């Protein structure tokens, strides 16, 4: 929808609504504030409407955005202890995992990108790390689902073009198939890093290193930790699209923090510090987060309004995994949370959230949608989440069970390439004889 529609009228009608008031140090206050925002978010939930799909939101919301939204509601539970939406979150994550429990559901497979699948993978690894209520024994488990996403994406690692990297799109018929973008590779990197920490398995860490090194070598990650958007294989990734988005740097920053936590390496510590400093310098105006590419010009599209929410989430993960970043990141999260709450004073309900938090004057900008609600939810709960989040792993109480072979038996024919063989050999080197001797192609 147009981001300029209704702005003037809305400003006149709703500019005097009272903004959401929240004491960020009080759990009950944050619970109340985020319940208002979460209720607004669920106004866009398709599953509550006749004929709607479980786990999906109303058009024009994208499938990947639904996965990210459930992660936000999961984080609300972790921060506040309020379990109101837990069953909905759990049901949605399982239903959308698809017929083969790999986040390739038949309704979306032909239009799905690697970034789309990866965001669902990040949601289920979040569930595993939080010790979220485990599915029944006859259902796929959170860790298993994350492993399925990882394994399938390894089979798509494309060394024939640009000497590595994931393409944006999975199928060649989709626009963007010839583009290797940062969000796909950054999400894969973070997922690998988190799986390494949760399972204490170096195979995942090795793939995290591969993804990071390739991203750096190709120019997605610059020497000063600027993170650009991607590149086309048509010129062998020699020309970089230099757009900078909040969620791209967040993906790499949090992934680097997980790798630091897993390895205690000074190399990863330096990288985390670099990303954190670049984030603070690039994406904050007077200590309040904003999206420079589109926010000032009011040109953010429907999903771009959600990107800031992911950066706040990833800042929390970063400060958790690499506590030396907390003195820099926590004050930014606090000031952003206050400003985001102040921007939730619009619409007919008086608590609809806008985009331009940097106004910081308890005024709604007239913009609304799923992305606005998602971002505000993540921002408002972030300071409390930082204090509440306990990131489990298998060795310290993480109860989710996995399957290192998940997702491989169901990989489409197009995945049965040299990378599939590379993955098989990689696991076998660690003593996992995971694949059947003969891969039957239909």
UniProtKB/Swiss-Prot annotation:
Molecular function, one GO term: mannan endo-1,6-alpha-mannosidase activity
Source superkingdom: Eukaryota
Sugar-modified residues: 25, 82, 107, 131, 201, 236, 261, 264, 277, 361
Keywords of this entry: Glycoprotein, Glycosidase, Hydrolase, Signal
GO aspect biological process, one term: fungal-type cell wall biogenesis
Enzyme class, first EC level, given as a word: hydrolase
Pfam families associated with the record: Glyco_hydro_76 (PF03663)
Catalytic activity reported: Random hydrolysis of (1->6)-alpha-D-mannosidic linkages in unbranched (1->6)-mannans
GO terms under cellular component: external side of plasma membrane
Signal peptide (from-to): 1-19
E.C. code: 3.2.1.101
Family: Belongs to the glycosyl hydrolase 76 family.
Name the UniProt record assigns to this protein: Putative mannan endo-1,6-alpha-mannosidase C970.02
Taxonomic lineage: Eukaryota, Fungi, Dikarya, Ascomycota, Taphrinomycotina
């Amino acid at each position: 929808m147009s981001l300029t529609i209704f702005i003037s009228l809305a400003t006149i009608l709703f500019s005097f609504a009272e903004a959401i008031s929240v004491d960020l140090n009080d759990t009950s206050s944050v619970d109340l504030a985020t319940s208002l925002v979460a209720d607004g978010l669920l106004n866009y939930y398709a599953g509550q409407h006749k004929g709607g799909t479980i786990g999906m939101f109303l058009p024009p919301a994208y499938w990947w955005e639904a996965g990210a939204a459930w992660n936000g509601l999961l984080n609300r539970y972790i921060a506040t202890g309020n379990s109101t939406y837990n069953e909905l979150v759990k049901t949605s994550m399982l239903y959308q995992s698809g017929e083969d429990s790999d986040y390739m559901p038949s309704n979306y497979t032909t239009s799905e990108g690697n970034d789309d699948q990866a965001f669902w993978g990040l949601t289920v690894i979040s569930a595993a790390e939080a010790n979220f209520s485990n599915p029944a024994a006859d259902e796929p488990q959170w860790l298993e689902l994350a492993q399925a996403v990882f394994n399938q994406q390894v089979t798509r690692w494309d060394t024939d073009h640009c000497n590595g990297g994931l393409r944006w799109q999975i199928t060649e018929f989709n626009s963007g198939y010839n583009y290797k973008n940062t969000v796909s590779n950054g999400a894969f990197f973070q997922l690998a890093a988190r799986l390494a920490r949760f399972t204490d398995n170096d195979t995942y860490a090795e793939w995290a290193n591969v993804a990071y090194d390739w991203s750096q070598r190709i120019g997605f990650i610059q020497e000063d930790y600027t993170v650009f958007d991607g590149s086309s294989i048509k010129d062998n990734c020699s020309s970089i699209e230099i757009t900078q988005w909040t969620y791209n740097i967040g993906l790499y920053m949090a992934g680097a923090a997980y790798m630091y936590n897993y390895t205690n390496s000074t190399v990863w510590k330096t990288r985390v510090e670099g990303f954190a400093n670049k984030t603070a310098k690039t994406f904050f105006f007077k200590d309040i987060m904003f999206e420079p590419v589109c926010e000032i010009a009011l040109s953010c599209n429907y999903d771009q309004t959600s990107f800031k929410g992911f950066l706040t989430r990833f800042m929390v993960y970063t400060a958790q995994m690499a506590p030396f970043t907390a003195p820099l990141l926590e004050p930014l999260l606090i000031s952003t949370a206050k400003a985001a709450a102040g921007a939730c004073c619009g619409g007919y309900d008086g608590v609809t959230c806008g985009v331009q938090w940097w106004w910081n004057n308890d005024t709604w900008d007239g913009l609304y949608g799923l992305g606005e609600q998602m971002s505000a939810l993540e921002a408002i709960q972030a300071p409390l989440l930082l204090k509440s989040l306990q990131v489990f792993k298998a060795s310290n109480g993480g109860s989710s069970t996995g399957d290192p072979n998940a997702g491989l038996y169901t990989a489409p024919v197009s995945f049965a390439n040299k990378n599939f063989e590379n993955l098989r050999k990689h696991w076998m080197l660690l003593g996992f004889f995971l694949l059947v001797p003969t891969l039957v192609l239909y």
